[in-house]
Amino acid sequence: MNLNNKNRLTKDIVVYENFIDAETADKLVKVLDKHAELGTISWMPISFYESYSSVLPQDNDEHVISEGLPADIFTQIKEGIINAVASVHDLDPKIISQIGYHTQKWEPGAYARIHSDNTDEHGNSGAFTRSRYAAFLYLNENFEGGLLQFPEQELSIKPKVGMLAAFDGGFNNMHEVTLITSGVRYTIGSFWDDREEDAYPQELRDAWAAEMKETRAKQEVERAEWQELLKKGYKIDQDGNVYHFKQDVDQHD
């Protein structure tokens, strides 16, 4: 992974141009699409509208190998991201603890409203406290919209194929993803902490678990409502308005 093209946009927002090359990124998308076609991975709706997530293929995956990629490419990418995240604050990569590492697919009409990755909208910490750092690897750029924006910093990042964006996920870096107006946006998303879970008091962890359970239940209800509308041929825009759209054959169930 290439960490040489480091561009520090703010003290805690960094992009790495050509973290992976365009050919590798294109092959990774083909691998993901092949797995989805075969049903060996499933795109599951997440908390952002018309955004879907899946686990990544394991090392020695036959479709990875058939594309001529290293058998452990996804492990290599993860290790590279760990080093990139650590580099934002000159941390020892050995202390970086994985919270989430997955792929995401953003369909036309998808967006993410302004949010903090590890606090609520008022800056209060809770169940997502450990998502201190975020990093997103962009696997394609043949879509319209889908900018990563930090309104407070008046900063807008246009995804480029192979680019990695790494930043502190907290209240000081509230961010959003603008509406995908056409095409499909593929990313590898990840969240990280700089300490292990057992560094936090058990009582606090128990409180987080209870809050997480409640939050996930609410999100599941919301996602079910979204999916029901999709089946009927309707989507929801960023302002909450429902509109009709032309359905494709392979709508998500």
For each predicted feature, which ranges?
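Fe(II)/2-oxoglutarate oxygenase catalytic core
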Residues: 1-164, 172-253
